[in-house]
């Protein structure tokens, strides 16, 4: 599958998308179905959950946590060049397999997995002479996909089923953003790590900012 998730311009595209993009797309589907009121009601409930999209390749990947691993503590046994190499490797890394997440936080580094290939496509604006423009797209590997976490809801399932044909992201009129929907239960190893109450560092899976109550 191929998609365009804009990063500010047509000639740039991200590998994944944030929850607000999906929420907007679901709202449009709900309006088309005449179920906007029901969707708004569900979205306003405390148990409503909708995360950003992340890669799935033989298992779920997580976003790289900010501030980890820590390279600011001097280790006299490590060469300065090696420290710089590790810092560069960590900077390039975008997503971490769930099973390697703890190891990464504790300082173990590894190469970033390839989930898709970014291409630049040149298109012509109809009925306008010489109006060429470029669109950046991401084509996902056959063994890669994207996943989101959401609370169980018949309406959400119905909206997502419809959205797979409408598509998500930019340039949908060109056929981008369509997908094959699969609904799965969260693995216990993942579900057990999700929490709303925790004394210690946590990482949000939805692009958001904290507020004081």
Language model: regions and residue ranges:
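Conserved active-site/ligand-binding neighborhood in enzyme cores
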Residues: 1-213
């Amino acid at each position: 599958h191929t998609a365009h998730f804009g990063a500010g311009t047509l000639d740039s595209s991200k590998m994944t998308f944030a929850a607000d993009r999906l929420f907007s797309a679901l709202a449009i589907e709900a309006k088309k179905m005449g179920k906007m009121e029901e969707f708004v009601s569900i979205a306003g409930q405390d148990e409503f959950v909708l995360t950003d999209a992340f890669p799935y390749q033989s298992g779920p990947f997580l976003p790289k946590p900010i501030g980890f691993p820590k390279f600011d503590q001097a280790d006299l046994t490590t060469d300065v060049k090696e420290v710089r190499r590790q810092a560069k490797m960590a900077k390039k890394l975008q997503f971490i397999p769930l099973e390697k997440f703890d190891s990464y936080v504790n300082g173990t580094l590894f190469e970033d997995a390839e989930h898709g290939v970014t291409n630049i496509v040149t298109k012509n604006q109809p009925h306008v002479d010489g109006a060429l423009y470029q669109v950046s797209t991401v084509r996902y590997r056959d063994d890669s996909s994207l996943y989101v976490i959401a609370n169980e809801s018949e309406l959400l399932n119905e909206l997502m089923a419809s959205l797979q044909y409408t598509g998500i992201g930019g340039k949908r009129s060109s056929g981008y953003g369509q997908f094959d929907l699969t609904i799965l239960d969260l693995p216990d190893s993942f579900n057990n790590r999700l929490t709303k109450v925790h004394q210690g560092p946590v990482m949000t899976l939805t692009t958001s900012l904290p507020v004081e109550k």
